[in-house]
């Protein structure tokens, strides 16, 4: 009975786990060392289409029709023996072809192992070394398909003494001191699987898209799509998610693995990640995208819909509403500032006109005051009322004023001043003359 109960319990647990992971496929954690190369924030309006860019030309897959001529090794030497100080290509070899020696002098003197791309040993053998062979040699490995380039440098010195022959490391490169006339081997060994064996590349290239809802950690992200270079595609989740999130069929041909999300909704917010795995080339990259959904901006318009005059006759048995529909939407800020500018300009013009009117009024009032003063002097002042009393002058005339003068001229002038002849002065006549002028 206990064993039967345990079996039933295990069956229930298995059923629960299958139900839980039916719509939530966890992300692949087999490559925790994926390098995060970019983090982007993407905002899109609700109802639109969002494109999460994920491109890598190192992931472009092309069928190798040249028997894998994309791997090559070549040896170069930098020599100062002839004083020209130049780099010279010695030999090269493709993974599917024979090695090629560039100089006729080196034919039969230098060579690499024929099984170099199988064994991973790319060492260069030089027979009957001479002083002209001294220099800095470089072993260059190129993988054009994976965009990998590796270089190993070795310095070769020639000596005529057997005791001086040795090998050591100078901190940057290996140094070999070889006896003149002997055979020397410059080591270059790389047994990485990229250089030694050929994999089925389309089975080792895969792209994953994962999604993390807000608050969900990376290790519990949901898998959306798996896409292999062979053309196999796996989509996860409900049908509506598989229909709205997709990658183009030419992804591996163009290196464009961008995810397109159609008809965005608020539930589509979260963290998306694009995982690029090229196991053959050792490429493991991850790109992260923070997706935010915003509300669309509505255009503000004023729409007036009116019916035409040629409407059919109104049926009295049918209750109808109004024929005019007015839809008023708040105006934009630009229109508000335009109206405000018109109002301010009108007020400014009114103030200028008011200032001009006040100035003219004050001028007219000043002219009126001057006119009243002249008129008042003409009407109210009667010069006849003023009389000149000359009785007092006779007193000064009769008086005998004796003054001491320095000469006769001053005395005569003083006597003339004391004599005031009687004269009648008509003041009214003189004032009238002045006024008429």
Curated annotation (Swiss-Prot):
Residues 23-339 are extracellular. The keyword DNA-binding does not apply. It holds the Pfam family V-set. The chain crosses the membrane at residues 340-360. Disulfide bonds join 54-139, 188-274. It is found in: Cell membrane. One of its GO terms (cellular component) is cell surface. GO terms for biological process: cell adhesion; cell differentiation. It comes from the Eukaryota. InterPro entries: Ig-like_dom, Ig-like_dom_sf, Ig-like_fold, Ig_sub, Ig_V-set, MXRA8. Residues 361-437 are cytoplasmic. Glycans are attached at residues 41, 121, 246, 304. SMART domains: IG, IGv. Residues 32-159, 167-294 form the Ig-like V-type domain. Residues 1-22 form the signal peptide. It is a single-pass type I membrane protein. Keywords: Cell adhesion, Cell membrane, Disulfide bond, Glycoprotein, Immunoglobulin domain, Membrane, Repeat, Signal, Transmembrane, Transmembrane helix. Transmembrane protein which can modulate activity of various signaling pathways, probably via binding to integrin ITGAV:ITGB3. Mediates heterophilic cell-cell interactions in vitro. PANTHER family: MATRIX REMODELING-ASSOCIATED PROTEIN 8. Homodimer in cis. Does not appear to form trans-homodimers. This is Matrix remodeling-associated protein 8. It comes from Gallus gallus (Chicken). The gene is MXRA8.
